[in-house]
């Protein structure tokens, strides 16, 4: 049975404080809340981390760079994550996938931003039209790690250590060699004890590991190579070599 109902405008309209419309939905190769793809590195690697997609003009107006950490803010909450340029979106629009909750991303995911309004007949929530603003975030101390082997066990052990970070993202990647990938950031360096815990759980605390430390800048770098291949690495303090090292892996 079809019902011919009168059009009703979205509950939340754009305004000066929240000039962007946030849309959300699923990605092709992720399964709902990742109950399946969250355990399969080959599937997870299709899109490794939650990204806020924005039109390039909107990014330029806010002086945002592709991959930069941003704060997405609505009337109900806020979320930190990287921004991604996507000119298939119209100016004034932004998109954030539904799949990432607080298991793989610090925070409550996109539902911390959406509104509770729903269609009076179908009861479908109004998840496609939340007013938001996006601004650059300065988190000077950054962290990146990649480690092969026992990815689920490592993830369960490492996840609690990042509760105090302003931003933390966890993902799986790899086809023949599954790996856990971690990206995090905060205002101040964590304690030496916490960093030692991270190194131990990443398998970077002993053995044939290349090490570089600059205590004055709170910078540390670790790379484990086995049989001519990178099998684990961490960059703490600054992560400029992240993409290059990941390509070598």
Task: Kindly give the residue locations of the regions a language model identified.
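Long, low-complexity segments enriched in small/aliphatic residues
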Residues: 1-39
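Short capping micro-motif at the N-terminus of alpha-helices
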Residues: 2, 81-83, 233
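Long, contiguous, secondary-structure-rich segments that constitute the structural scaffold
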Residues: 17, 33, 37-53, 57-205, ...
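Histidine- and/or cysteine-centered catalytic micro-motif in compact active-site loops
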Residues: 25-27, 57, 75, 235
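Flexible, glycine-rich terminal cap/loop adjacent to redox cofactors
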Residues: 212-249
């Amino acid at each position: 049975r079809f019902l011919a109902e009168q059009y009703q405008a979205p509950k939340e309209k754009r305004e000066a404080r929240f000039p962007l419309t946030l849309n959300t939905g699923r990605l092709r190769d992720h399964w709902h809340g990742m109950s399946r793809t969250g355990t399969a590195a080959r599937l997870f690697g299709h899109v490794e981390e939650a990204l806020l997609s924005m039109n390039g003009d909107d990014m330029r107006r806010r002086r945002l760079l592709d991959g930069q950490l941003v704060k997405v803010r609505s009337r109900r909450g806020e979320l930190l994550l990287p921004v991604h340029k996507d000119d298939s979106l119209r100016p004034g629009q932004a998109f954030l996938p539904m799949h990432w909750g607080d298991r793989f991303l610090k925070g409550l995911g996109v539902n911390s931003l959406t509104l509770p309004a729903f269609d009076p007949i179908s009861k479908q929530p109004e998840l496609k039209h939340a007013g938001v603003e996006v601004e650059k975030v300065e988190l000077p101390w950054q962290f990146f790690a990649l480690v092969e082997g026992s990815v689920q066990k490592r993830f369960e052990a490492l996840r609690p250590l990042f509760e105090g970070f302003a931003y933390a993202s966890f993902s799986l990647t790899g086809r023949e060699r599954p790996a856990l990938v971690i990206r995090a950031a905060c205002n101040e360096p964590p304690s030496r004890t916490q960093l030692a815990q991270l190194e131990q759980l990443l398998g970077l605390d002993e053995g044939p590991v290349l090490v570089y430390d600059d205590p004055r800048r709170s910078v540390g770098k670790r790379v484990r190579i086995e049989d001519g291949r990178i099998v684990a690495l961490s960059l703490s303090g600054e992560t400029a070599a992240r993409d290059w090292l990941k390509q070598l892996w």
